[in-house]
């Protein structure tokens, strides 16, 4: 945890993002990449309905109602994260 903060320059991690499971984070990345549920499912070897369930869960955890809000959030995270 401390090493992760140092890698990010000492800034605290967003607790909403920290609450996401690794699979939800992968799906969030797919959303940010502009992929459909079907495309995300094909990439992650999941059924489209399963992806839809994950999307609903991650939207709830992030406090969003729209997929586009999640895409903007993920894009902003990418922009502010350090390599």
Predicted regions and their residues:
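Short, flexible helix-to-coil linker/hinge segments that flank and couple to helix-turn-helix
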Residues: 1-18, 22, 26, 78-79
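Residues at secondary-structure transition points
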Residues: 15-22, 30, 45-49, 53
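Short helix-capping/turn signature of helix-turn-helix
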Residues: 32-35, 75-78
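Actinobacteria-biased recognition of intrinsically disordered, low-complexity terminal regions
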Residues: 81-83
